[in-house]
Design a protein with these regions (language model features):
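Gly/Pro/Ser/Thr-rich low-complexity, intrinsically disordered segments predominantly at protein N-termini
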Residues: 1-125
């Protein structure tokens, strides 16, 4: 029996999704994401605010972004992720659409549902 070939998706497929649908693209496969919980958002906003304030207090030029913020991890257009928090110090990585290449620092707020994806799948892509 022949093997069934999975479809390989691209960033264009991600952009074709309905606006209210959150997903990431890893090695050409789409992974849909549930909306974050209120607790998740509280943690994300507090960390983002603290990091941004620290960077400013030290006169740093790094930029701090909270999800949704696009990170394109390869030139082949088949890996697109949205870390919960991204810190980018190399301005050459920033485009109008997001960050090309791995941010200088990422933070993933891990929940039981996202543990495998955050600790394994995405970690090895960064």
């Amino acid at each position: 029996m022949p093997l069934i070939k999975e479809k390989t998706y691209t960033i264009d497929d991600i952009y074709a999704l309905p606006e209210d649908e959150r997903a990431e693209l890893i090695d050409g496969q789409i992974y849909y994401m549930a909306p974050p919980t209120r607790k998740h958002q509280d943690i994300s906003m507090e960390l983002s605010s603290q990091i941004k304030a620290y960077v400013r207090s030290k006169g740093g030029q790094c930029k701090v972004y909270a999800a949704p913020f696009a990170v394109y991890l390869d030139e082949a257009a088949n890996t697109y992720v949205e870390p919960d928090i991204s810190v980018i110090c190399d301005k050459n990585k920033l485009t109008d659409k997001g960050c090309k290449g791995a941010p200088d620092w990422i933070i993933e707020i891990v929940s039981p549902a996202s543990r495998r994806m955050d600790y394994y799948t995405k970690l090895f892509k960064y």
